[in-house]
Structures are given as C-alpha cells and as structure tokens.
Amino acid sequence: MTIFEGSFTNASTLKVGIVIARFNDLITNKILSGCLDCLKKHGLDTSELSNQVDIVWVPGSFELPIAAKTLMKKKSYDVVIALGAVIRGETSHYDVVISEASKGISQVSNENNVPIIFGVLTTDTLQQALERAGIKNNLGWNYALQAIEMGSLIKNLN
C-alpha cells in the first residue's frame, strides 16, 4: 500500500497565487497578512521582489473565479488561494455571491488541475468576521497551511 500526503517541510519550492477581494478589505487585509505570515514561516519568499508568490486584487468575492482562471493561464502555480469576506446582509445577495464564488472556484480548480483553497469567510456579522481575521484567530494562516499541504500533495502525485 502506498500512502500519499502533503508535506509542510518542502514548502519553499511551491509557486503560490493569491486572488483576494477588496470588498470588506478591513477583513481581507488581515486574512492576507495571516496567510503571508504562514507562507513566510514555512520558507516561501513573500517579499515584493518574490517570484514565488503573486497577489491579484479583485473588487469582490464574485470575481475571484475569473481572476484565478486568468492568473493560471499567465503562469504555472502549484496552488492558488482565493481570499474574501462576505457578511450576510438583509437581502439574498449574500447567498448568490457565496454560491457562485464557491462553484466558480471549484470549477476553475478542476478544469486546471490546480488546487484552489477556498479562503472566503462567510459570516452573519462583522464581529464574526473580525474574530476569524485576527481578534481570536486568523484563518489566513489556516488557508496558507491548506495551500502548502495541497500544493505539495499534488506535486508528489504528479
């Protein structure tokens, strides 16, 4: 029996793309910071001159799939992280954005055979989003760990 797993020890060889929504940037900037901190601590070069990590800003979470798709056509990535924050309001807009963003990201990932980490916070309140972006825990760190694990796993499988 062969067991394949992702590794956290050889992360420094990964090429990572990040697509991030500007809407709710009070939250998304914090998530990005946590994400970059984790990548750096695992050996990736996150400096502005880095060829290892690319960041693309989009208006909102609805635009994440097309940006991820276009980014992957431009360069080869081991993994892409899609970051956003959608906070429930009084209309059905929340449900539409989350549904389409998640479906689109999954479709782009499968079409390109590249893992895309779904790092879009979906919360009922701003307070919940703030808690997940750093007051209690920064989920950006978790999304980066998922990216490292999946990126290395797919490299091992190929």
Curated annotation (Swiss-Prot):
Tell me the function of this protein. Answer: Catalyzes the formation of 6,7-dimethyl-8-ribityllumazine by condensation of 5-amino-6-(D-ribitylamino)uracil with 3,4-dihydroxy-2-butanone 4-phosphate. This is the penultimate step in the biosynthesis of riboflavin.
The record's annotation in SUPFAM superfamilies points to: Lumazine synthase
The opening ranks of the lineage are: Bacteria, Bacillati, Cyanobacteriota, Cyanophyceae, Synechococcales
CDD domains associated with the record: Lumazine_synthase-I (cd09209)
Tell me its EC number(s), please: 2.5.1.78
Pathway terms, separated by semicolons = Cofactor biosynthesis; riboflavin biosynthesis; riboflavin from 2-hydroxy-3-oxobutyl phosphate and 5-amino-6-(D-ribitylamino)uracil: step 1/2
Family to which this protein belongs: Belongs to the DMRL synthase family.
> What protein is this chain from?
6,7-dimethyl-8-ribityllumazine synthase
Q: Which residues bind (2S)-2-hydroxy-3-oxobutyl phosphate?
A: E90, T91, R132
Keyword Transferase in the entry? The reply is yes
Q: Could you confirm whether the keyword ATP-binding appears in this record? A: no
Please list the GO biological process terms of this entry: riboflavin biosynthetic process
As its record notes, the protein acts as a catalyst of: (2S)-2-hydroxy-3-oxobutyl phosphate + 5-amino-6-(D-ribitylamino)uracil = 6,7-dimethyl-8-(1-D-ribityl)lumazine + phosphate + 2 H2O + H(+)
Sites where the protein binds 5-amino-6-(D-ribitylamino)uracil: F23, S61, F62, E63, A85, V86, I87, F118
Which UniProt keywords are given for this protein, alphabetically ordered? Riboflavin biosynthesis, Transferase
One GO CC term, this protein = riboflavin synthase complex
The record's listing under PANTHER family reads: 6,7-DIMETHYL-8-RIBITYLLUMAZINE SYNTHASE, 6,7-DIMETHYL-8-RIBITYLLUMAZINE SYNTHASE DMRL SYNTHASE LUMAZINE SYNTHASE
Pfam families for this protein = DMRL_synthase
Could you say which enzyme class this protein belongs to? transferase
